[in-house]
């Protein structure tokens, strides 16, 4: 399973301009290596994103370097983070 996300603002990855990213599901090995979920559930059962962790998953699942994740527009970061979180439900 994978999700294609069209970016509002293009970034550069591997020396090339990128206007869409394909996110694949993380493997169990990758989840264990990151050691955290991309979201948190509080006492009232509200879900919120953990953006630092989500950024790690975006890099891994999209196959781009962390420096490219840092170039993302905030709206794109939010959309990609929720897409990553959806892999865990």
Q: What are these language model-derived features?
A:
Residues 2-89:
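Short, surface-exposed, charged amphipathic helix/loop patches that serve as local interaction elements
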């Amino acid at each position: 399973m994978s999700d294609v996300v069209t970016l509002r603002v293009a970034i550069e990855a591997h020396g090339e301009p990128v206007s869409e990213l394909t996110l694949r599901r993380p493997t169990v090995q990758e989840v264990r290596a990151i050691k955290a979920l991309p979201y948190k559930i509080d006492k009232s059962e509200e879900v919120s994103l953990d953006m630092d962790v989500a950024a790690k998953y975006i890099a891994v699942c999209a196959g781009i370097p962390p420096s490219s994740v840092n170039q993302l527009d905030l709206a794109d970061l939010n959309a990609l983070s929720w897409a990553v979180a959806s892999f865990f439900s």
